[in-house]
Amino acid sequence: MSNSVPSSVRGKLTPDAPLAPLVWFKSGGTADWLFEPRDVADLQDFLAGLAPEVPVMALGLGSNLIVRDGGVPGVVIRLGKAFAKVAKVDEVTLDCGGGASGILVSSTARDNGIAGLEFLRSIPGTVGGFVRMNGGAYGREVKDVLVDCDVVIRSGEIVTLPLSELGYTYRHSNLTDGSIVVAARFRGHPGNPEAIQAEMDRISAAREASQPLRSKTGGSTFKNPDGGKAWELVDKAGCRGLQIGGAQVSEKHTNFLINTGTATSAEIEGLGEEVRRRVKASSGVDLEWEIKRIGRP
Protein backbone atom coordinates (compact mmCIF):
# COMPACT_ATOMS: atom_id res chain seq x y z
CA MET A 1 0.00 0.00 0.00
CA SER A 2 3.01 2.30 0.32
CA ASN A 3 2.62 3.42 -3.30
CA SER A 4 -0.84 4.72 -2.42
CA VAL A 5 0.43 7.00 0.36
CA PRO A 6 2.23 10.30 -0.33
CA SER A 7 5.76 10.24 1.06
CA SER A 8 6.49 13.97 0.88
CA VAL A 9 4.83 15.25 4.04
CA ARG A 10 5.96 17.82 6.60
CA GLY A 11 4.29 16.05 9.50
CA LYS A 12 4.95 12.55 10.85
CA LEU A 13 3.93 9.48 8.82
CA THR A 14 4.35 6.12 10.58
CA PRO A 15 3.69 2.69 9.03
CA ASP A 16 2.21 -0.16 11.08
CA ALA A 17 1.66 2.19 14.03
CA PRO A 18 0.44 0.74 17.37
CA LEU A 19 -2.87 2.34 18.33
CA ALA A 20 -3.42 0.75 21.77
CA PRO A 21 -1.31 3.41 23.55
CA LEU A 22 -3.41 6.13 21.90
CA VAL A 23 -6.87 4.90 22.94
CA TRP A 24 -8.50 4.84 26.36
CA PHE A 25 -9.16 1.10 26.37
CA LYS A 26 -5.40 0.45 25.80
CA SER A 27 -6.21 -2.44 23.46
CA GLY A 28 -6.29 -3.19 19.76
CA GLY A 29 -4.01 -3.54 16.76
CA THR A 30 -1.99 -1.23 14.55
CA ALA A 31 -2.88 1.31 11.88
CA ASP A 32 -1.55 0.58 8.41
CA TRP A 33 -0.45 4.22 8.54
CA LEU A 34 -0.64 6.92 11.20
CA PHE A 35 -0.34 10.50 9.93
CA GLU A 36 0.16 13.47 12.24
CA PRO A 37 0.04 16.56 9.98
CA ARG A 38 2.13 19.65 10.67
CA ASP A 39 -0.75 21.99 9.86
CA VAL A 40 -3.94 22.26 7.80
CA ALA A 41 -2.06 22.73 4.51
CA ASP A 42 -0.02 19.58 5.21
CA LEU A 43 -3.24 17.64 5.81
CA GLN A 44 -4.80 19.01 2.62
CA ASP A 45 -1.77 18.10 0.51
CA PHE A 46 -1.63 14.61 2.02
CA LEU A 47 -5.29 13.85 1.35
CA ALA A 48 -5.12 15.31 -2.15
CA GLY A 49 -2.22 12.99 -2.96
CA LEU A 50 -3.67 9.91 -1.26
CA ALA A 51 -5.11 7.24 -3.55
CA PRO A 52 -8.91 7.64 -3.41
CA GLU A 53 -9.53 4.01 -2.47
CA VAL A 54 -7.49 4.28 0.76
CA PRO A 55 -9.79 4.65 3.80
CA VAL A 56 -9.18 7.54 6.20
CA MET A 57 -10.32 8.15 9.76
CA ALA A 58 -9.50 10.70 12.44
CA LEU A 59 -8.31 9.85 15.95
CA GLY A 60 -8.66 12.35 18.77
CA LEU A 61 -7.99 11.51 22.41
CA GLY A 62 -9.02 7.90 21.75
CA SER A 63 -12.09 7.86 23.97
CA ASN A 64 -15.36 6.43 22.69
CA LEU A 65 -13.46 3.97 20.50
CA ILE A 66 -12.68 0.27 20.22
CA VAL A 67 -9.78 -0.48 17.86
CA ARG A 68 -10.19 -4.12 16.86
CA ASP A 69 -7.27 -6.50 17.35
CA GLY A 70 -6.60 -6.97 13.63
CA GLY A 71 -5.74 -3.30 13.21
CA VAL A 72 -7.11 -0.48 11.07
CA PRO A 73 -6.76 -0.45 7.28
CA GLY A 74 -5.73 2.70 5.49
CA VAL A 75 -4.69 5.90 7.25
CA VAL A 76 -5.48 7.09 10.76
CA ILE A 77 -5.04 10.86 11.12
CA ARG A 78 -4.21 12.36 14.50
CA LEU A 79 -4.30 16.13 14.99
CA GLY A 80 -1.50 17.33 17.25
CA LYS A 81 -0.56 20.52 19.08
CA ALA A 82 -0.83 22.71 15.98
CA PHE A 83 -4.56 21.94 15.97
CA ALA A 84 -5.10 22.39 19.71
CA LYS A 85 -5.31 26.18 19.91
CA VAL A 86 -8.33 28.07 21.26
CA ALA A 87 -8.80 31.81 20.67
CA LYS A 88 -11.48 34.38 21.48
CA VAL A 89 -13.29 35.73 18.39
CA ASP A 90 -15.69 38.14 20.10
CA GLU A 91 -17.35 38.60 23.48
CA VAL A 92 -19.20 35.28 23.31
CA THR A 93 -17.44 33.21 20.61
CA LEU A 94 -14.34 30.97 20.58
CA ASP A 95 -12.41 29.66 17.57
CA CYS A 96 -11.17 26.17 18.46
CA GLY A 97 -8.78 23.82 16.68
CA GLY A 98 -9.96 20.30 15.93
CA GLY A 99 -7.34 18.86 18.28
CA ALA A 100 -8.32 21.00 21.28
CA SER A 101 -9.79 19.15 24.26
CA GLY A 102 -13.16 19.90 25.80
CA ILE A 103 -11.35 20.88 28.99
CA LEU A 104 -9.27 23.50 27.15
CA VAL A 105 -12.32 24.93 25.37
CA SER A 106 -14.35 25.27 28.57
CA SER A 107 -11.42 26.68 30.54
CA THR A 108 -10.69 29.29 27.85
CA ALA A 109 -14.38 30.22 27.84
CA ARG A 110 -14.25 30.69 31.62
CA ASP A 111 -11.14 32.87 31.41
CA ASN A 112 -12.93 35.10 28.90
CA GLY A 113 -16.23 35.28 30.79
CA ILE A 114 -18.12 33.13 28.27
CA ALA A 115 -20.79 30.93 29.86
CA GLY A 116 -22.72 28.06 28.30
CA LEU A 117 -19.72 25.93 27.30
CA GLU A 118 -19.14 24.38 30.73
CA PHE A 119 -20.55 21.00 29.67
CA LEU A 120 -17.75 20.55 27.13
CA ARG A 121 -15.45 20.00 30.10
CA SER A 122 -17.12 16.65 30.70
CA ILE A 123 -16.79 15.33 27.13
CA PRO A 124 -13.65 13.16 27.06
CA GLY A 125 -12.46 14.05 23.59
CA THR A 126 -11.36 16.69 21.12
CA VAL A 127 -13.31 19.29 19.17
CA GLY A 128 -13.01 17.25 15.98
CA GLY A 129 -14.58 14.23 17.61
CA PHE A 130 -17.42 15.85 19.47
CA VAL A 131 -18.36 18.07 16.53
CA ARG A 132 -18.55 14.95 14.34
CA MET A 133 -20.80 13.04 16.75
CA ASN A 134 -22.77 15.93 18.31
CA GLY A 135 -21.26 15.09 21.67
CA GLY A 136 -23.11 16.10 24.78
CA ALA A 137 -23.50 15.76 28.52
CA TYR A 138 -25.66 17.05 31.36
CA GLY A 139 -28.55 18.08 29.14
CA ARG A 140 -26.60 19.94 26.46
CA GLU A 141 -25.16 19.01 23.06
CA VAL A 142 -22.69 20.50 20.59
CA LYS A 143 -25.60 21.57 18.39
CA ASP A 144 -26.64 23.99 21.16
CA VAL A 145 -23.39 25.98 20.94
CA LEU A 146 -21.82 25.36 17.51
CA VAL A 147 -21.73 28.19 14.97
CA ASP A 148 -19.84 26.46 12.15
CA CYS A 149 -16.83 24.24 11.49
CA ASP A 150 -13.95 23.90 9.03
CA VAL A 151 -13.69 20.45 7.48
CA VAL A 152 -10.99 19.02 5.23
CA ILE A 153 -12.85 16.55 3.03
CA ARG A 154 -11.38 13.39 1.54
CA SER A 155 -10.25 15.16 -1.65
CA GLY A 156 -8.13 17.61 0.38
CA GLU A 157 -10.48 20.56 -0.13
CA ILE A 158 -11.38 22.62 2.94
CA VAL A 159 -14.98 23.72 3.44
CA THR A 160 -16.76 25.69 6.15
CA LEU A 161 -20.08 24.16 7.16
CA PRO A 162 -22.67 26.04 9.23
CA LEU A 163 -24.57 24.23 11.96
CA SER A 164 -27.61 23.90 9.69
CA GLU A 165 -25.71 21.71 7.20
CA LEU A 166 -24.47 19.10 9.69
CA GLY A 167 -27.75 17.21 9.98
CA TYR A 168 -27.36 16.76 13.72
CA THR A 169 -29.41 14.18 15.58
CA TYR A 170 -28.61 12.40 18.86
CA ARG A 171 -24.86 11.57 18.76
CA HIS A 172 -24.80 11.79 14.96
CA SER A 173 -23.94 14.15 12.10
CA ASN A 174 -23.97 13.75 8.33
CA LEU A 175 -20.22 14.36 7.97
CA THR A 176 -18.85 11.86 5.47
CA ASP A 177 -16.25 9.20 6.23
CA GLY A 178 -12.74 10.49 5.65
CA SER A 179 -13.61 14.13 6.38
CA ILE A 180 -11.59 15.75 9.18
CA VAL A 181 -12.90 18.57 11.39
CA VAL A 182 -9.92 20.92 11.77
CA ALA A 183 -11.62 23.86 13.53
CA ALA A 184 -14.96 24.99 14.95
CA ARG A 185 -16.56 28.10 16.38
CA PHE A 186 -18.61 27.83 19.58
CA ARG A 187 -20.89 30.56 20.94
CA GLY A 188 -21.92 31.00 24.55
CA HIS A 189 -23.22 34.02 26.45
CA PRO A 190 -21.69 36.53 28.86
CA GLY A 191 -21.01 35.13 32.31
CA ASN A 192 -19.06 35.55 35.51
CA PRO A 193 -15.82 33.50 35.55
CA GLU A 194 -16.37 32.44 39.18
CA ALA A 195 -19.89 31.22 38.43
CA ILE A 196 -18.62 29.43 35.32
CA GLN A 197 -15.92 27.71 37.38
CA ALA A 198 -18.50 26.70 39.98
CA GLU A 199 -20.59 25.03 37.27
CA MET A 200 -17.50 23.26 35.89
CA ASP A 201 -16.69 22.05 39.41
CA ARG A 202 -20.25 20.75 39.83
CA ILE A 203 -19.99 18.81 36.56
CA SER A 204 -16.58 17.41 37.50
CA ALA A 205 -17.85 16.26 40.89
CA ALA A 206 -20.88 14.60 39.32
CA ARG A 207 -18.67 12.72 36.86
CA GLU A 208 -16.23 11.69 39.58
CA ALA A 209 -19.04 10.36 41.74
CA SER A 210 -20.81 8.36 39.04
CA GLN A 211 -18.24 7.27 36.43
CA PRO A 212 -15.15 5.00 36.55
CA LEU A 213 -12.76 7.78 35.56
CA ARG A 214 -9.64 6.05 36.87
CA SER A 215 -10.22 2.95 34.73
CA LYS A 216 -9.29 1.98 31.18
CA THR A 217 -12.67 2.67 29.63
CA GLY A 218 -14.17 4.15 26.47
CA GLY A 219 -16.82 6.34 28.03
CA SER A 220 -20.55 5.80 27.52
CA THR A 221 -20.98 2.50 25.69
CA PHE A 222 -24.57 2.64 24.45
CA LYS A 223 -26.82 5.45 23.32
CA ASN A 224 -29.74 6.21 25.58
CA PRO A 225 -32.93 4.82 23.98
CA ASP A 226 -35.91 7.13 23.51
CA GLY A 227 -37.38 7.92 26.90
CA GLY A 228 -34.93 5.78 28.82
CA LYS A 229 -31.44 5.40 30.23
CA ALA A 230 -29.06 2.77 28.87
CA TRP A 231 -27.47 2.14 32.27
CA GLU A 232 -30.83 1.34 33.86
CA LEU A 233 -31.61 -1.26 31.19
CA VAL A 234 -28.14 -2.82 31.56
CA ASP A 235 -28.59 -2.96 35.34
CA LYS A 236 -32.10 -4.42 35.04
CA ALA A 237 -30.69 -7.17 32.79
CA GLY A 238 -28.32 -8.18 35.59
CA CYS A 239 -25.13 -7.10 33.84
CA ARG A 240 -23.48 -5.01 36.57
CA GLY A 241 -19.98 -6.47 37.01
CA LEU A 242 -20.45 -8.97 34.14
CA GLN A 243 -17.06 -10.08 32.82
CA ILE A 244 -15.63 -11.71 29.69
CA GLY A 245 -11.90 -12.29 29.93
CA GLY A 246 -10.32 -9.01 30.98
CA ALA A 247 -13.38 -6.94 30.01
CA GLN A 248 -15.97 -6.00 32.61
CA VAL A 249 -19.18 -3.99 32.93
CA SER A 250 -18.33 -1.29 35.47
CA GLU A 251 -19.72 -1.80 38.96
CA LYS A 252 -19.82 1.99 39.34
CA HIS A 253 -21.70 2.87 36.14
CA THR A 254 -23.25 0.09 34.06
CA ASN A 255 -23.06 2.00 30.76
CA PHE A 256 -19.26 1.84 30.99
CA LEU A 257 -17.12 -1.12 29.96
CA ILE A 258 -13.65 -1.35 31.46
CA ASN A 259 -10.42 -3.13 30.64
CA THR A 260 -9.39 -4.66 33.96
CA GLY A 261 -5.82 -5.10 32.74
CA THR A 262 -5.21 -7.36 29.78
CA ALA A 263 -8.48 -7.39 27.84
CA THR A 264 -8.38 -7.77 24.08
CA SER A 265 -10.62 -5.59 21.96
CA ALA A 266 -12.49 -8.77 20.97
CA GLU A 267 -13.31 -9.37 24.64
CA ILE A 268 -14.47 -5.78 25.14
CA GLU A 269 -16.65 -5.78 22.02
CA GLY A 270 -17.90 -9.29 22.81
CA LEU A 271 -18.93 -8.16 26.28
CA GLY A 272 -20.83 -5.26 24.77
CA GLU A 273 -22.68 -7.60 22.42
CA GLU A 274 -23.52 -9.94 25.32
CA VAL A 275 -24.93 -6.97 27.24
CA ARG A 276 -27.02 -6.01 24.19
CA ARG A 277 -28.34 -9.59 23.97
CA ARG A 278 -29.30 -9.68 27.66
CA VAL A 279 -30.98 -6.26 27.54
CA LYS A 280 -33.00 -7.34 24.49
CA ALA A 281 -34.12 -10.47 26.35
CA SER A 282 -34.88 -8.51 29.53
CA SER A 283 -36.51 -5.34 28.22
CA GLY A 284 -37.10 -5.88 24.51
CA VAL A 285 -34.87 -2.89 23.72
CA ASP A 286 -32.15 -3.01 21.06
CA LEU A 287 -29.36 -0.93 22.57
CA GLU A 288 -27.34 0.96 19.97
CA TRP A 289 -23.58 1.30 20.35
CA GLU A 290 -22.37 4.82 21.10
CA ILE A 291 -18.74 3.68 21.13
CA LYS A 292 -17.34 3.41 17.62
CA ARG A 293 -15.77 0.07 16.67
CA ILE A 294 -13.20 0.19 13.89
CA GLY A 295 -10.78 -2.10 12.12
CA ARG A 296 -10.33 -5.78 11.40
CA PRO A 297 -11.33 -8.47 13.94
Curated annotation (Swiss-Prot):
**What keywords sit in the KW lines?**
Cell cycle, Cell division, Cell shape, Cell wall biogenesis/degradation, Cytoplasm, FAD, Flavoprotein, NADP, Oxidoreductase, Peptidoglycan synthesis
Mention one GO molecular function: FAD binding
List the PROSITE patterns hit by this protein, alphabetically.
FAD_PCMH
Q: Which Gene3D superfamilies match?
A: 3.30.465.10, UDP-N-acetylenolpyruvoylglucosamine reductase, C-terminal domain (3.90.78.10), Uridine Diphospho-n-acetylenolpyruvylglucosamine Reductase, domain 2 (3.30.43.10)
Q: Which reaction does it catalyse?
A: UDP-N-acetyl-alpha-D-muramate + NADP(+) = UDP-N-acetyl-3-O-(1-carboxyvinyl)-alpha-D-glucosamine + NADPH + H(+)
Q: Does the keyword Cell cycle apply?
A: yes
Q: Which family does it belong to?
A: Belongs to the MurB family.
Protein name, entry field: UDP-N-acetylenolpyruvoylglucosamine reductase
Q: Which residues form the active site?
A: R171, S220 (proton donor), E290
- Alphabetical list of InterPro entries matching this protein: FAD-bd_PCMH, FAD-bd_PCMH-like_sf, FAD-bd_PCMH_sub1, FAD-bd_PCMH_sub2, MurB, MurB_C, MurB_C_sf, Oxid_FAD_bind_N
Domain (FAD-binding PCMH-type): give its ranges: 26-191
Q: Report any one BP term from Gene Ontology.
A: regulation of cell shape
Its biological purpose:
Cell wall formation.
The record ties this protein, via Pfam families, to: FAD_binding_4, MurB_C
| Protein's pathway | Cell wall biogenesis; peptidoglycan biosynthesis
Cofactor(s) required for function per UniProt: FAD
What SUPFAM superfamilies would the database entry show? FAD-binding/transporter-associated domain-like, Uridine diphospho-N-Acetylenolpyruvylglucosamine reductase, MurB, C-terminal domain
Entry's Gene Ontology cellular component terms: cytosol
- Cellular localization per UniProt: Cytoplasm
EC number(s) per UniProt?
A: 1.3.1.98
